[in-house]
Amino acid sequence: ISGADISDSYTQLFTAIREKNFKKMRAWVVNHIDLEPASIYRGIYDKMYDHVAPNSIPQLVLILADYQYKNAFVADHELNLVACMTEIMANVEIKS
């Protein structure tokens, strides 16, 4: 996957989160679960300044760190990733 494709993919994820579209967000996770979950958390972290309101960045960092830690212990990585995105959806302001 090229860098442009990955960047566009994260834009799709942030759009689904901003729109509070659980179905689209979950579909994104399902389509990307073959990636290492740690790389998804890192990808969101790397793209946050482009997509997240500045006042929400500290909250996003805490959520990502928490779910990345939990990732080491969970049986179902997809469920953990969807839970993370749901918490971001509920607590982080995404730029329009």
Where are these regions (language model features)?
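Helix-rich C-terminal "collar"/helical-bundle subdomain used as an assembly and partner-interaction module
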Residues: 12-96
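Conserved alpha/beta core segments of nucleic-acid transaction machinery
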Residues: 1-16
